[in-house]
Every structure is written in C-alpha cells, then in structure tokens.
A protein has these predicted regions:
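Charged- and aromatic-enriched interaction segments used to assemble
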Residues: 104-238
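A structural detector for beta-sheet-dominated domains
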Residues: 23-25, 38, 43-45, 57-59, ...
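A broad, low-specificity signal marking well-ordered, structured residues that form hydrophobic/aromatic
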Residues: 54, 75, 96, 110, ...
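Short beta-strand and beta-hairpin "edge-sheet" elements
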Residues: 83-112, 199, 344-374
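Beta-strand-rich assembly/attachment modules of structural machines
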Residues: 1-135
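Acidic, small/polar-enriched beta strand-loop surface segments
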Residues: 1-29, 188, 212-364
Length: 381
C-alpha cells in the first residue's frame, strides 16, 4: 500500500474532502505545471500490461509543442484526502503518457497509460545480445535506453544480484524485462527468471517486486460497513495450475538446470495436487483421494541458470496460478493508497473475514467509492 497516515486511513469512512491534482511535463518529469482538473478515473490493475491507466478531462490547457500534446507530454495525478483540522494528504494516482487526446468543448479528454507503455513502444531496431551481467545491470540498460534517468526499485525478496547469461532480445524490450517469448518461442524476461514481476508504480518508478501471495501481511481491513454494495463471489478454473515444472535451458548444449517442481501440498485446499505428484503420482488413487486433479504448467528459460533460481521461479509461478478460480467483487469506500497485489481482509458476511489479494481497484477521481476485484485461495468445504 502507498504511504498514508493513520489519521487519513481512519477517516476514509467519514465525510472527507477529496480534491484532485493534475500536473503535466514536457521534459521527462524534471519540471511540472499544474493543470485544471475536470473529471476522470483511474484503473490500477495487476493483470494489465500497464499497471495504471486513466481517463481524464483537463480544462483549457495550453496545447501544441509547448503545451499538452500526445508525443512528449507526461501526466501526474494525485488524489487528495482532506481530514478535518489537517492539511490535505496527497496520494499518487499514477504517472502517465498520453495514449489518445481529444479536443472537447471545455478542454481536452485524455486516455492515459502508465510508463510501461514508453518501454513497450521502444522496440529494438535490431536484435541484440544483452549480458552476461547481473539482473540489475541488464535491467538498468534496457530501461535506461527507453526512459533516460528513470530510477528502478528492487523490492526486498527479489534477487537482483543474480548473474544472468548472455541472451538475445529480438525486438520486444518490455518482454525482455517482464516475461514473454521471443520469435523462436523461447521464454524470456528478467523478472520472470527471478520469480518476480515488474511494473511502473503509482509514482512512475519502474519496480521489480516479488509475486504477491496471500501469506503477505494484511495492509487494510474492510469491515462490512465500509462496503457500499453486497460482495459478489465467483469461481472459475481458468488459468489454474497446481503443479509447475521449471527448467533452465540455454539451447547451447550445456547441461540443463532443473527441473524444479512446486505443487499445492495443502490437503485442505481444493487445488491439492496430492502428496507428491512427481515421484508418486498414484498416491491419490491408493489413498482414496478421488477429488485430486493435477493441472501441470511448464516454464523453460535460458535465463534460469541455477537450481535455486529454478526453485524460486517455480514457487512464484505456483503462487500466481493458485486461487485465481475464487474471486470476490465488491464496492467499498475509496482508499486511493491501495495498490494491486496488496492483501486485504474483507468481512464477507457478518463475522466472516477472508484474506483477499487485490487484482484491480478502479475509482473515480474525487469519488468516495471504489470497485475491487480480488482473488483468494480455496479450501475444501
């Protein structure tokens, strides 16, 4: 969760002022100019390639080369919380580039995307070899070429000092940083090879962070009186994997790393994969565990060079693919400090509290409510 004072957090359910601040810059964020905000909304979404997106209308801004344009202009948004007898507390609501600009009667309407879009658009003109070097140094080069001078944050738990072998980046700079496949179908991605994820946060900083899990600390409790609509529960098995097999293969004929295995070993879980689906796949039949279903996923990357690294990736993949079939949608009072990947505790019904991981939490700037989409682990009924 973004920094927020205890007083502001406690006042979210009360009558508070919700001012909005918008700023624009044409020099990469070295200087900022205030803009008159009309209306708009922000969509933080962990499942989107750009973690933050927004749509806003600005009133009578300057236009053209020295004003707001769709080529060089970057936009910063802030949601304020006005607690009585205290100064307004400003919470970052995203640092954006302009995807689309439309002239309106009162000013301009803007569709905005996070700074990932700059990196995504800066494709390599020719294939290039990156490394061998540490993950931090490889990421610094790829990010710095697209966003000169941009800081990179490495959250605790991400092993940025991991040595990576030389690898070829065909075109897609963002895939080389986050994850994907090259033109030959080989898995790439510095973050994926570390069992991590990468995104531009609400302040515009490119961030490498561990894949969030429900074991992370709870950042906010949402009692029933904070909800403005009845929670809606939903289940689907789309994207469910309860056994991951991870290997490292450079394709050069050298020894293959792994395989590393990770599976759901909790007998109380609906997605339980059995006591050992690798060494003893017949155990569920022998033990009468007729409800066990194994769903296997595989990941191979030339950037995985040690057994420990393969183990980390397998655990991260498992954490990200379990529980996606159990989700909760609800509308609550707006907490602009909430980030995708945060773990919250929700009072689903009277006295029944559940841990949920925030996937998305869109809200109207200046509004008092937000719509949350979450997921959680499933347990046997």
């Amino acid at each position: 969760m973004l920094p927020i004072s205890p007083a502001a957090l406690a006042a979210l359910g009360q009558a508070t002022r919700r001012p909005v601040r918008a700023q624009w810059s044409n020099d990469g964020g070295r200087t900022w100019t205030d803009a008159r905000f009309g209306s708009g909304s922000v969509t933080p979404d962990r499942t989107a390639e750009c973690r933050y997106s927004a749509s806003v209308e600005l009133l009578a801004p300057p236009r053209g080369r020295s004003g707001i344009n769709s080529i060089t202009t970057e936009i910063r948004l802030f949601q304020g919380i006005g607690v009585p007898r205290r100064d307004v507390e400003w919470i970052p609501a995203g640092w954006y580039v302009i995807d689309r600009l439309k002239q309106t009667r009162l000013g301009v309407s803007l569709d905005l995307l996070g700074r990932e879009d700059v990196i995504r658009g800066a494709s390599l003109p020719t294939a290039r070899t990156v490394g061998p070097d540490t993950a931090k140094e490889c990421a610094r080069v790829l990010v710095g070429e697209a966003l000169p001078g941009a800081p990179i944050a490495w959250r605790s738990g991400v092993k940025g000092s991991t040595a990576l072998p030389a690898f070829v980046v065909d075109e897609d700079r963002w895939a080389a940083l986050s994850g994907g496949t090259d033109t030959s179908g080989v898995s790439t991605g510095i973050a994926a090879s570390l069992g991590a994820e990468v995104y531009a946060d609400a302040t515009g900083i490119v961030t490498f962070a561990p894949v969030p899990t429900l074991a992370d600390p709870v950042v906010w409790q949402i009692p029933r009186h904070f909800a403005t609509a009845e929670p809606s529960e939903e289940e689907t098995n789309e994207g469910l994997v309860n056994l991951w097999v991870v290997t490292g293969d450079s394709g050069s004929g050298s020894a293959t790393v792994g395989p590393a295995y990770a599976w759901d070993d909790d007998p109380a879980s609906l997605t339980y994969a059995g006591p050992d689906p690798v060494a003893d796949p017949l155990a569920p039949q022998r033990l009468g565990l007729h409800g066990v279903r194994v769903r296997t996923g595989r990941y191979t990357s030339p950037l995985v060079t040690t057994q420990g690294q393969a183990d980390d990736v397998a655990q991260a993949k498992l954490a990200d693919s379990l529980g996606v079939q159990a989700s909760l949608s609800f509308t609550s009072v707006c907490n602009p400090a909430l980030e995708p990947g945060d773990v919250v505790e929700v009072e689903v019904s009277e006295g029944r509290w559940e841990r949920h991981l925030i996937d998305s939490s869109p809200y109207a700037l200046g509004g008092v409510s937000m719509a949350c989409q979450t997921r959680t682990s499933t347990r046997r009924l």
